């Protein structure tokens, strides 16, 4: 997921995507504990995507406040 793609989405769409990714991260962590993951880097990638979305949301909110 690219940051430039995220900038084109509205705050509501970003928040929906954020909720989706947090759910996915939760499921990945549970799967890792129970049976292990074939792709352990997927957790890291999901966390980075969450951070990107949060960054874009904060940038947009600061832009609206100014």
Curated annotation (Swiss-Prot):
One of its GO terms (cellular component) is cytosolic large ribosomal subunit. The keyword Ribonucleoprotein applies. It comes from the Bacteria. GO terms for molecular function: structural constituent of ribosome. Transmembrane segments: none annotated. PANTHER family: 60S RIBOSOMAL PROTEIN L35/50S RIBOSOMAL PROTEIN L29, LARGE RIBOSOMAL SUBUNIT PROTEIN UL29C. This is Large ribosomal subunit protein uL29. It comes from Hydrogenobaculum sp. (strain Y04AAS1). The gene is rpmC.
